[in-house]
């Protein structure tokens, strides 16, 4: 009888453990204590620090690509380090806790009021380690955008983001019960929190839009560029990690602008200027180093990356690519008259689709046109690769736009900004006439947002630049970013952002473009805009926008040196 009673007890226990329809079972073990990063909507100025803290928690290793952190693959993350908990609180005091996977920044579950909800197809790792002291239930849809939008009934392009939307989303997640049946408010709330947490951690462009909306207590709907970023984070990460050391992508990242026009991005520099991508999904890692370097000499050795994921390794080699090269004044590197003869001059010409502007970047360090090598001699020319010293045909492309011949240490230079100008090799003074971009030869028109989310503003030649509130379509705040590294007044592209000299506290003004060292700028992954000639960065003087002064200054890491480009100011 005692045995029968015990068996009945075990049967009843098993049945009770199933709970209501949709409830989950898991192995009852002591769960790990996962790190937590919280955000309270009543502290609007804490949104940026909240995202920095979240990024620090999900980045477990020191693997980087072009100075951007790369998340660890699943095979290298233990269950005890797999998740980060993110409690979100709205002004009404409602709190919901998200569980975020450190492998991909996905929201995989959420919990509130003693209940937790997992997406359809949740894994044992998730169920056995997350919210085990709650009643676990499984939703009848997955966490991807297609599934969530299907539940809502329309796309996220129509769903506002901002403090009001986030507050409502938190309440929707907190009050949801599986028995209620209506998943539309829940799915809508999930679309809001995923974009305002995970996507903002992936892209500083998205962070800026949301941070501005929180500061201004306003709402906005995602533009098509933002949505295309969200849809292409994986492909961006892959292209960046497989790129040649100079940032040349093996393929093309397909984005859309705000008017739904296609944008084809073929190098890291342009992709970063468009998206300010902040974190990469793991794809490829260098074999010989844990990061790619921007240093021209170190970059001579092309590092062959390896794909690690799913318990296997797959070699992911750097490949040859064929691209145009844009330089001073937006002119392209061109073989004179397209003549296929040894010694023919390499010059500047208007960018077009001509064959004589298509250069192949080989993994042996050569740059070739129809098989002939870009070659250094008394001038820069094309020549049979097999009949000249190999060191005369080697080049290193850096992400700052410098193209260096390692043997001489000299860099590719355009002596004049004129069609037909023969290229030369000169000492590197980091001048704009020595700046180049591979692929993406058209200038990018953008706003430049800095301290207190205000926009860089100009008032014509021989005047200072300063910060003012951003105003959509204000021509004084529109800039054209050229492949030569210049920042030009979009309404008059003969005018360049210029440092008066190259010493700390020198003012930044607008002058005629001359291809000089004080007119070349680099948008860095740490958020600064540096002048490589001076080795100083753009700085809002004394962190005081009322002074109306932007200066050169040594890097400090302070907010008054942080900048971001955006084609759609918030």
UniProtKB/Swiss-Prot annotation:
1-gamma repeat boundaries on the chain: 408-440
Residues with glycosylation annotation: 40, 62, 140, 232, 492, 526, 544
Domain comment (free text): The B-chain consists of six tandemly repeated subdomains. Only subdomains 1-alpha and 2-gamma possess a functional carbohydrate-binding site.
2-gamma repeat placement: 534-567
Disulfide bonds: 284-316, 332-351, 373-385, 455-470, 496-513
Annotated organism of origin: Sambucus nigra (European elder)
Gene name, Swiss-Prot/TrEMBL: SNA-If
Expression sites (tissue/organ): Expressed in fruits.
Top-rank taxon: Eukaryota
2-beta repeats: 493-531
GO molecular function: carbohydrate binding; nucleotide binding; rRNA N-glycosylase activity; toxin activity
Gene Ontology BP term (one): negative regulation of translation
UniProt protein name: Ribosome-inactivating protein SNAIf
Family: Belongs to the ribosome-inactivating protein family. Type 2 RIP subfamily.
1-beta repeats: 370-405
Active-site annotation: 199
Functional summary from the UniProt entry: Neu5Ac(alpha2-6)Gal/GalNAc specific agglutinin. Behaves as a type-2 ribosome-inactivating protein. Strongly inhibits mammalian but not plant ribosomes. The A chain is responsible for inhibiting protein synthesis through the catalytic inactivation of 60S ribosomal subunits by removing adenine from position 4,324 of 28S rRNA. The B chain binds to cell receptors and probably facilitates the entry into the cell of the A chain; B chains are also responsible for cell agglutination (lectin activity). Involved in plant defense against insects.
Reactions catalysed, as given in the entry: Endohydrolysis of the N-glycosidic bond at one specific adenosine on the 28S rRNA
Domain Ricin B-type lectin per the UniProt entry, residue ranges: 319-439, 441-566
Subunit relationships: Tetramer of four pairs of disulfide bound A-B chains.
Posttranslational mods: The precursor is processed in two chains, A and B, that are linked by a disulfide bond. A small truncated form corresponding roughly to the second ricin B-type lectin domain of the B chain, TrSNAIf, can also be produced. N-glycosylated.
